[in-house]
């Protein structure tokens, strides 16, 4: 019925989070696992193999297929899991799970109920970010948080913890080909748009999952901003028109507001990081926000299903 896939790079370095991610999947009635592991060593695959052996799960482990691209990305990892599922299994549902996401009790019941609807192609469990795993039991969904989550999903999709219908995946492969390998940050937006273009429904479940990445948190606390990376992948996503504004007028008005907020942001960052680094971080953050808002507006005005095909699509599957 169900195949579980995990997309990871150095997941074992996340320690307890990674192990709890694995344990939480036991609520799902799967017998087979697909591990797409682009790690720097074999520590992650060893942890997953130990888990699979302990719980009687069949494990198929591999690195990403590159599909003619120069390196592994989140898009190649996700597409590899999809292709392995379509090629090697007859099950109707593929679950894709990121390595820092812990499913909350009841996640599978909600996903299974959603996919009983024959027109539903994707189920996404809302992810609740926490700074400390001890906060996991106290997460509450208030109105503001719910609105922010829904707006973000409708703008650019989410794939942290998703259940996908086989026929929807096969239809996407046939109509649009592979997820563009260059979409390292926005492969989730592409997948959502492809689902919608083919008329498949998407359901968000609010039992959801906890997301906690200790590596990213430590970088954020140190003031690490990967602005060049964010800018590059936002520009790449713009080619496909997959990031789209939900409230067009609001996003247009917020373009100048983002610039107006720069002095306050600079003050806050320099207080925390010092004058030179603080200014650099504030400018980088503002640049990223401006470009993202512009791309959202552009996507809402010009995005279409015809833009989804990868520009360098291969003639045969690798």
What is the role of each PLM region?
Residues 202-214:
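Catalytic beta-strand/loop signature of glycosyltransferases that borders the donor
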Residues 37-47, 101-102:
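A conserved acidic beta->alpha catalytic loop
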Residues 11-27:
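Short, well-formed alpha-helical segments that are part of the catalytic scaffolds
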Residues 181-193:
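Acidic donor-binding loop at a coil-to-helix junction in glycosyltransferase catalytic cores
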Residues 208, 219-248, 290-301:
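Catalytic core of nucleotide-sugar-dependent glycosyltransferases
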């Amino acid at each position: 019925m169900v195949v579980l896939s995990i997309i990871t790079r150095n997941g074992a370095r996340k320690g307890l989070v990674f192990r709890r991610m694995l344990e939480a999947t036991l609520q799902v009635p799967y017998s087979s696992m697909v591990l797409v592991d682009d790690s720097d060593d074999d520590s992650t695959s060893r942890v997953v193999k130990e888990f699979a052996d302990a719980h009687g799960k069949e494990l198929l482990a591999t690195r990403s297929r590159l599909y003619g691209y120069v390196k592994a990305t989140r898009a190649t990892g996700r597409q590899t899991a999809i292709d392995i599922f379509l090629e090697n299994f007859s099950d109707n549902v593929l679950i894709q799970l990121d390595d820092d996401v812990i499913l909350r009790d009841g996640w599978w019941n909600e996903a299974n109920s959603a996919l009983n609807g024959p027109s539903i192609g994707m189920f996404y469990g809302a992810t609740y970010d926490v700074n400390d795993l001890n906060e996991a039991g106290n997460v509450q969904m208030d109105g503001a948080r719910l609105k922010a989550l829904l707006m973000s999903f409708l703008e650019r999709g989410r794939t942290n913890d998703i259940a996908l219908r086989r026929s929807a995946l096969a239809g996407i492969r046939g109509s649009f080909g592979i997820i563009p390998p260059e979409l390292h940050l926005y492969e989730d937006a592409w997948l959502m748009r492809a689902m919608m273009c083919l008329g498949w429904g998407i359901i968000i479940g609010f039992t959801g999952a906890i997301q906690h990445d200790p590596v990213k948190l430590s970088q954020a606390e140190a003031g690490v901003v990967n602005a060049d990376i964010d800018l590059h992948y936002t520009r790449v996503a713009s080619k496909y028109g997959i990031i789209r504004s939900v409230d067009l007028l609001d996003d247009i008005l917020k373009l100048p507001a983002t610039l107006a907020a720069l002095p306050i942001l600079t003050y806050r960052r320099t207080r925390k990081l010092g004058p030179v680094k603080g200014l650099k971080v504030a400018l980088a953050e503002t640049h990223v926000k401006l470009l993202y808002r512009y791309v959202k507006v552009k996507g809402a005005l010009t995005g279409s299903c015809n833009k989804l095909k990868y520009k360098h699509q291969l003639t045969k599957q690798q």
